[in-house]
Amino acid sequence: MSLYLYACLGDEYDYKPNYKCDTAGIPYSHAPGNIGDIEIFNGDRYWLIEATLIQGKAQQVNSETINLFRHIDDEHSGTKYMSLVAPYIHTDTELLLKVATIVSMEEKKSLLFSKPYNVSDFINILKNGDCIADMQDTTWRFVAKLGDFLNKVHLPRG
């Protein structure tokens, strides 16, 4: 995946694959604990990509979502991005990622954009579009929908 990212994005970014590879560069295991699989960064952006073969709801939600937020590198300044890439993305995984992104932005007082992708969508957006813009659009649309809903609801304040 790192080579494909480089082929699509070029020299604009620095790439740091953290997964374990053999001498030919073929991955054979995930990244060690408390670190994401692939980190991509430049002066004003930090992008964490977690790649997994896990497809089940319980495993995705429990093993591949909230951990991403712990893996985000707070030492890099600028806007942060996160992608979860799997053969299948469960709808609960997508919802949890959206909500946790908003909570994380509020807690850390910094911009964070995220989106889970199935493998074919991730390949297509990298090849034909702008993954960064796609993550931004997805996050801002969710924020807008949430804001619209909250503005319409008149709950008693206590």
Predicted regions located by residue number:
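Catalytic core segments in nucleotide and nucleic-acid processing enzymes
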Residues: 1-158
